[in-house]
Amino acid sequence: MIICDFHNHTCFSADSDSTPESMIEKAIDLGLSYLCMTDHMDLDFPYTELDFTFDVSEYFKKHDELRQIYGDRIQLLTGIELGLQPGVYADLKDLLSKWDFDFVIGSSHLVDRVDPYFPIYWQDKTESAGILRYFETILENVADFDDIDVYGHIDYIVRYAPSKAAHYSYQKYQEILDEIIKTLISKNIGLELNTAGFKYGLGFPNPHMDILKRYRELGGEIITIGSDGHVPEHLAYDFKKVPEILKACGFDHYTIFQKRKAEFIKL
Protein backbone atom coordinates (compact mmCIF):
# COMPACT_ATOMS: atom_id res chain seq x y z
CA MET A 1 0.00 0.00 0.00
CA ILE A 2 1.18 3.51 -0.84
CA ILE A 3 1.03 5.44 2.43
CA CYS A 4 1.28 9.04 1.20
CA ASP A 5 -0.20 11.48 -1.29
CA PHE A 6 2.31 14.14 -2.29
CA HIS A 7 0.30 16.10 -4.86
CA ASN A 8 -3.14 17.48 -4.05
CA HIS A 9 -4.97 20.78 -3.84
CA THR A 10 -7.29 22.59 -1.46
CA CYS A 11 -9.18 25.88 -1.50
CA PHE A 12 -5.85 27.70 -1.34
CA SER A 13 -5.72 26.80 -5.06
CA ALA A 14 -7.98 28.69 -7.47
CA ASP A 15 -9.25 25.47 -9.04
CA SER A 16 -10.32 23.75 -5.81
CA ASP A 17 -13.11 24.43 -3.33
CA SER A 18 -12.06 21.66 -0.95
CA THR A 19 -11.20 22.57 2.60
CA PRO A 20 -7.91 21.27 3.96
CA GLU A 21 -9.93 19.56 6.70
CA SER A 22 -11.95 17.57 4.15
CA MET A 23 -8.79 16.37 2.42
CA ILE A 24 -7.14 15.41 5.70
CA GLU A 25 -10.17 13.50 6.94
CA LYS A 26 -10.36 11.60 3.66
CA ALA A 27 -6.64 10.78 3.87
CA ILE A 28 -7.15 9.42 7.37
CA ASP A 29 -10.13 7.35 6.19
CA LEU A 30 -7.94 5.92 3.42
CA GLY A 31 -5.29 4.90 5.92
CA LEU A 32 -2.58 7.23 4.65
CA SER A 33 0.32 7.97 6.98
CA TYR A 34 1.40 11.20 5.25
CA LEU A 35 -0.45 13.94 3.42
CA CYS A 36 1.51 16.71 1.73
CA MET A 37 -0.74 19.48 0.42
CA THR A 38 0.75 21.19 -2.63
CA ASP A 39 -1.34 24.19 -3.55
CA HIS A 40 -0.78 26.15 -6.75
CA MET A 41 1.56 29.12 -6.98
CA ASP A 42 1.48 30.26 -10.60
CA LEU A 43 2.89 33.78 -10.64
CA ASP A 44 2.04 36.03 -13.59
CA PHE A 45 -0.68 33.65 -14.77
CA PRO A 46 -2.13 35.17 -17.96
CA TYR A 47 -5.76 34.29 -17.30
CA THR A 48 -6.75 36.98 -14.83
CA GLU A 49 -10.14 35.49 -13.97
CA LEU A 50 -8.23 32.90 -11.94
CA ASP A 51 -5.66 33.86 -9.32
CA PHE A 52 -3.34 30.89 -8.91
CA THR A 53 -1.52 32.44 -5.96
CA PHE A 54 -2.24 32.41 -2.25
CA ASP A 55 -1.22 34.09 0.99
CA VAL A 56 1.73 31.96 2.06
CA SER A 57 1.62 33.26 5.62
CA GLU A 58 -2.01 32.15 5.96
CA TYR A 59 -1.14 28.82 4.34
CA PHE A 60 1.53 28.04 6.93
CA LYS A 61 -0.66 29.32 9.75
CA LYS A 62 -3.50 27.03 8.66
CA HIS A 63 -1.21 24.02 8.31
CA ASP A 64 0.24 24.62 11.78
CA GLU A 65 -3.29 24.73 13.21
CA LEU A 66 -4.21 21.52 11.40
CA ARG A 67 -1.15 19.73 12.74
CA GLN A 68 -2.36 20.53 16.24
CA ILE A 69 -5.75 18.99 15.45
CA TYR A 70 -4.80 15.98 13.32
CA GLY A 71 -1.14 15.38 14.14
CA ASP A 72 -1.77 12.28 16.22
CA ARG A 73 -3.56 10.59 13.29
CA ILE A 74 -1.59 11.61 10.22
CA GLN A 75 1.63 13.44 9.42
CA LEU A 76 0.80 16.67 7.59
CA LEU A 77 3.45 18.22 5.40
CA THR A 78 3.48 21.61 3.74
CA GLY A 79 4.20 21.57 0.03
CA ILE A 80 3.70 23.82 -2.95
CA GLU A 81 3.34 23.40 -6.72
CA LEU A 82 5.19 26.14 -8.55
CA GLY A 83 4.10 27.03 -12.06
CA LEU A 84 7.35 27.53 -13.96
CA GLN A 85 7.73 29.98 -16.82
CA PRO A 86 10.25 32.66 -17.85
CA GLY A 87 10.02 35.88 -15.89
CA VAL A 88 9.06 34.45 -12.51
CA TYR A 89 12.18 32.56 -11.46
CA ALA A 90 13.62 35.35 -9.28
CA ASP A 91 10.33 35.81 -7.43
CA LEU A 92 10.02 32.06 -6.86
CA LYS A 93 13.56 31.87 -5.56
CA ASP A 94 12.79 34.71 -3.16
CA LEU A 95 9.61 32.95 -2.01
CA LEU A 96 11.42 29.70 -1.28
CA SER A 97 14.16 31.51 0.62
CA LYS A 98 11.59 32.93 3.04
CA TRP A 99 9.45 29.87 3.79
CA ASP A 100 10.33 26.44 5.12
CA PHE A 101 8.42 24.13 2.80
CA ASP A 102 8.67 20.37 3.16
CA PHE A 103 8.31 19.71 -0.56
CA VAL A 104 8.38 21.69 -3.80
CA ILE A 105 6.94 20.54 -7.12
CA GLY A 106 7.89 22.43 -10.26
CA SER A 107 5.37 22.13 -13.08
CA SER A 108 4.73 23.46 -16.57
CA HIS A 109 1.16 24.67 -16.98
CA LEU A 110 1.88 27.21 -19.73
CA VAL A 111 3.58 27.05 -23.10
CA ASP A 112 4.62 30.47 -24.37
CA ARG A 113 1.99 32.08 -22.14
CA VAL A 114 -0.83 29.77 -23.26
CA ASP A 115 -2.34 26.94 -21.23
CA PRO A 116 -2.68 23.85 -23.45
CA TYR A 117 -5.88 23.11 -21.55
CA PHE A 118 -7.50 25.62 -23.91
CA PRO A 119 -8.22 24.62 -27.54
CA ILE A 120 -6.66 27.86 -28.81
CA TYR A 121 -3.23 26.45 -28.01
CA TRP A 122 -3.67 23.76 -30.64
CA GLN A 123 -5.19 25.90 -33.41
CA ASP A 124 -2.00 26.99 -35.17
CA LYS A 125 0.14 23.88 -34.81
CA THR A 126 0.13 20.14 -35.29
CA GLU A 127 -0.42 17.99 -32.25
CA SER A 128 3.15 16.71 -32.45
CA ALA A 129 4.56 20.23 -32.62
CA GLY A 130 2.44 21.33 -29.68
CA ILE A 131 3.64 18.47 -27.52
CA LEU A 132 7.27 18.95 -28.56
CA ARG A 133 7.13 22.65 -27.70
CA TYR A 134 5.81 21.77 -24.24
CA PHE A 135 8.80 19.50 -23.64
CA GLU A 136 11.15 22.23 -24.87
CA THR A 137 9.78 24.61 -22.25
CA ILE A 138 10.55 22.08 -19.51
CA LEU A 139 14.20 22.12 -20.56
CA GLU A 140 14.14 25.93 -20.65
CA ASN A 141 12.65 26.07 -17.16
CA VAL A 142 15.12 23.73 -15.48
CA ALA A 143 18.04 25.46 -17.18
CA ASP A 144 17.18 28.66 -15.29
CA PHE A 145 15.39 27.41 -12.17
CA ASP A 146 16.20 24.19 -10.36
CA ASP A 147 15.17 24.84 -6.74
CA ILE A 148 12.55 22.10 -6.87
CA ASP A 149 12.37 18.56 -5.53
CA VAL A 150 10.49 16.94 -8.41
CA TYR A 151 9.16 18.01 -11.79
CA GLY A 152 5.42 17.43 -11.87
CA HIS A 153 3.48 15.43 -14.45
CA ILE A 154 6.04 16.04 -17.19
CA ASP A 155 3.69 14.90 -19.96
CA TYR A 156 0.73 16.84 -18.53
CA ILE A 157 0.03 18.26 -21.96
CA VAL A 158 -1.18 14.89 -23.24
CA ARG A 159 -4.26 15.20 -21.02
CA TYR A 160 -5.46 18.01 -23.28
CA ALA A 161 -4.08 17.06 -26.69
CA PRO A 162 -6.77 16.83 -29.39
CA SER A 163 -6.39 13.05 -29.64
CA LYS A 164 -5.22 12.66 -26.04
CA ALA A 165 -2.79 9.74 -26.06
CA ALA A 166 -3.80 8.17 -29.37
CA HIS A 167 -0.62 9.34 -31.13
CA TYR A 168 1.61 9.83 -28.10
CA SER A 169 4.49 7.67 -26.95
CA TYR A 170 7.81 8.06 -25.20
CA GLN A 171 9.51 6.71 -28.32
CA LYS A 172 8.08 9.49 -30.49
CA TYR A 173 9.74 12.15 -28.32
CA GLN A 174 12.62 10.06 -27.01
CA GLU A 175 15.41 12.48 -27.87
CA ILE A 176 14.03 15.43 -25.94
CA LEU A 177 12.59 13.31 -23.13
CA ASP A 178 15.97 11.69 -22.57
CA GLU A 179 17.52 15.15 -22.44
CA ILE A 180 14.94 16.22 -19.85
CA ILE A 181 15.51 13.10 -17.76
CA LYS A 182 19.30 13.44 -17.85
CA THR A 183 19.07 17.11 -16.92
CA LEU A 184 16.78 16.40 -13.97
CA ILE A 185 19.04 13.62 -12.70
CA SER A 186 22.11 15.85 -13.00
CA LYS A 187 20.37 18.45 -10.83
CA ASN A 188 19.08 15.88 -8.31
CA ILE A 189 15.49 16.63 -9.28
CA GLY A 190 13.10 13.70 -9.20
CA LEU A 191 9.93 12.75 -11.02
CA GLU A 192 6.48 12.20 -9.67
CA LEU A 193 4.10 9.43 -10.58
CA ASN A 194 0.85 11.37 -10.95
CA THR A 195 -2.19 9.10 -11.09
CA ALA A 196 -4.50 11.75 -12.56
CA GLY A 197 -3.66 10.33 -15.97
CA PHE A 198 -5.97 7.45 -15.12
CA LYS A 199 -8.70 9.89 -14.09
CA TYR A 200 -8.37 11.67 -17.44
CA GLY A 201 -8.80 8.38 -19.31
CA LEU A 202 -5.25 8.13 -20.63
CA GLY A 203 -4.77 4.59 -19.37
CA PHE A 204 -1.44 5.49 -17.77
CA PRO A 205 -0.12 7.88 -15.12
CA ASN A 206 1.72 11.09 -15.87
CA PRO A 207 4.36 10.58 -16.97
CA HIS A 208 3.91 7.45 -19.05
CA MET A 209 5.43 4.27 -17.62
CA ASP A 210 8.04 4.22 -20.40
CA ILE A 211 9.34 7.58 -19.17
CA LEU A 212 9.46 6.35 -15.58
CA LYS A 213 11.30 3.23 -16.72
CA ARG A 214 13.80 5.28 -18.71
CA TYR A 215 14.35 7.60 -15.74
CA ARG A 216 15.20 4.56 -13.63
CA GLU A 217 17.47 3.09 -16.34
CA LEU A 218 19.44 6.33 -16.44
CA GLY A 219 19.96 6.27 -12.69
CA GLY A 220 17.00 8.23 -11.39
CA GLU A 221 15.93 7.32 -7.86
CA ILE A 222 13.61 10.07 -6.59
CA ILE A 223 9.99 9.19 -7.35
CA THR A 224 7.08 10.69 -5.43
CA ILE A 225 3.45 9.62 -5.67
CA GLY A 226 0.58 12.06 -6.07
CA SER A 227 -3.05 11.99 -7.09
CA ASP A 228 -3.37 15.64 -8.17
CA GLY A 229 -6.72 15.42 -6.39
CA HIS A 230 -8.71 18.64 -6.08
CA VAL A 231 -11.58 17.01 -4.16
CA PRO A 232 -11.45 14.43 -1.37
CA GLU A 233 -12.91 11.73 -3.61
CA HIS A 234 -9.86 11.91 -5.87
CA LEU A 235 -7.27 11.67 -3.11
CA ALA A 236 -4.98 8.64 -3.57
CA TYR A 237 -6.72 8.06 -6.92
CA ASP A 238 -5.98 4.58 -8.28
CA PHE A 239 -3.05 4.19 -5.88
CA LYS A 240 -3.74 0.46 -5.87
CA LYS A 241 -2.09 0.34 -9.31
CA VAL A 242 1.06 2.15 -8.22
CA PRO A 243 3.18 -0.60 -6.58
CA GLU A 244 3.08 -2.84 -9.65
CA ILE A 245 3.77 0.09 -11.97
CA LEU A 246 6.80 1.09 -9.93
CA LYS A 247 8.14 -2.46 -9.83
CA ALA A 248 7.64 -2.84 -13.59
CA CYS A 249 9.64 0.36 -14.09
CA GLY A 250 12.53 -0.92 -11.97
CA PHE A 251 11.81 0.74 -8.62
CA ASP A 252 11.80 -1.03 -5.27
CA HIS A 253 10.87 2.15 -3.39
CA TYR A 254 9.13 5.49 -3.59
CA THR A 255 10.00 8.83 -2.04
CA ILE A 256 8.65 11.27 0.53
CA PHE A 257 10.11 14.63 1.48
CA GLN A 258 10.35 16.36 4.83
CA LYS A 259 12.08 19.75 5.08
CA ARG A 260 13.18 19.30 1.44
CA LYS A 261 15.05 16.09 2.31
CA ALA A 262 14.25 12.89 0.42
CA GLU A 263 13.38 9.72 2.32
CA PHE A 264 12.90 6.38 0.57
CA ILE A 265 10.09 4.00 1.47
CA LYS A 266 10.41 0.37 0.39
CA LEU A 267 7.60 -1.14 -1.63
Regions found by a protein language model. Give the residues of each.
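Extended substrate/RNA-proximal surfaces in nucleic-acid metabolism proteins
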Residues: E49, T53-S186
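An N-terminally biased module of ancient metal coordination in phosphate/nucleic-acid-related enzymes
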Residues: M1-P86, L95-K98, Y160-P162, H167-Q171, ...
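Conserved residues at the C-terminal ends of beta-strands
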Residues: T38, S107, I154, N194, ...
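Structural preference for beta-strand elements that scaffold enzyme active sites
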Residues: I2-D5, Y34-C36, Q75-G79, D102-I105, ...
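Phenylalanine-focused residue identity feature
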Residues: F6, F12, F45, F52-F54, ...
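Charged catalytic cores and adjacent phosphate/nucleic-acid-binding surfaces used
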Residues: M1-F6, T10, S16, P20, ...
